[in-house]
Design a protein with these regions (language model features):
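Acidic (Asp/Glu)-rich catalytic clusters
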Residues: 1, 24-29, 51-59, 82-90
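Divalent metal-binding pocket/active-site signature
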Residues: 1-49
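Hydrophobic faces of well-ordered beta-strands that scaffold small-molecule active sites
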Residues: 10-12, 35-38, 62-64, 93-97
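Active-site beta-loop-alpha junctions enriched in small/polar residues
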Residues: 15, 40-43, 65-69, 98-102
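Charged helix-capping and loop-helix junction motifs
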Residues: 48-53, 74-82, 109-113
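Aromatic-anchored helix/helix-loop segment that forms the rim or "lid"
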Residues: 57-76, 93, 124
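Short acidic/histidine-rich active-site segments
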Residues: 90-107
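Mid-to-C-terminal alpha-helical segments outside catalytic/metal-binding sites
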Residues: 110-143
Length: 143
């Protein structure tokens, strides 16, 4: 397919968890080398850890988005994200802010708070560097 031939990134977008896995499976069959499960634990996707582990085994990066960690679900969401990253392995994960909307923190501030929240929940500096810098660079084909 076009994605494999042009070495593009296959992102699952806002597909359901089942559809996202289907895309990753088929992407692998088609020879796609760069894949990401977008917003894996957020609505409407809400993948289970076992689904994320399967996608990671198939070669996809699993994306966790911080959003506004100060909202009513922020602390519990950070707990879930940190736990999932530990179970899946930081080598298979990426993080992003998903910010920039009016009324939310600025992306740089929100992203810093997201990384601090993950560190407070036991992710090492090495893991944070991997999920925030090294893995995204790999996904994009950067050195």
């Amino acid at each position: 397919g076009v994605i494999a031939r042009r070495n593009l990134v296959l992102a699952t977008g806002h597909s359901s968890s089942e559809e996202g896995l289907m895309l990753v499976r088929e992407g692998g069959r088609q020879g796609v080398r760069r894949m990401v499960v977008t917003h894996a634990m957020n609505e409407p996707i809400v993948m289970s850890v076992s689904q994320m582990q399967e996608a990671a085994t198939l070669g996809a990066f699993i994306e966790f988005v911080g959003g506004n960690i100060g909202d009513k679900d922020g602390s519990a969401r950070m707990d879930r994200f940190a736990d999932a990253i530990k179970k899946i392995g930081a080598e298979h994960c990426i993080v992003s802010s998903d910010l920039g909307q009016k009324g939310n923190p600025l992306p740089a501030e929100g992203f810093g708070a997201f990384l601090a929240a993950l560190k407070a929940r036991g992710l090492s500096d090495q893991d944070l560097d991997r999920v925030s810098r090294r893995n995204p660079a790999t996904l994009l084909g950067l050195p």
